[in-house]
Regions:
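Ribonuclease/tRNase effector modules and their secretory precursors
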Residues: 1-103
């Protein structure tokens, strides 16, 4: 396994290539949502791995995207990045309305 480290993030190189092929977004592009003024975050425990994972929804190139990651050694380890599902977009828009930043 080859780990890529980039600005406080990390990811598996093969997983990143697979993600780009399937979802048409690189992990490097996806992490840009964390430098935007507003992104929504929630968490869950992955049943199989018993690991706390985070789901963040933000905007990249004018579209809502979802980034799934976990924390490892003070870095965010990216697991997946993709276009947001409808219910994720709804949660994100609700969050923006709540903080007074609706698009």
């Amino acid at each position: 396994m080859v780990t890529v480290v980039y600005k406080g993030f990390e990811w598996d190189k093969k997983k990143a290539a697979s993600n780009e092929k399937n979802h048409f977004i690189t992990f490097k592009e996806a992490v840009s949502i964390f430098s935007t003024p507003h992104y929504f975050r929630t968490s869950f425990v992955h049943k199989e791995y018993q690991e706390l994972r985070y789901i963040s929804v933000g905007v990249w190139q004018g579209k809502e995207i979802t980034v799934i990651y976990t924390l490892r050694k003070k870095r965010r380890r990216i697991i997946s990045a993709r276009r947001s599902r409808d219910y994720e977009k709804e949660h994100y828009q609700d969050y923006l309305r709540k903080i007074g930043a609706a698009r």
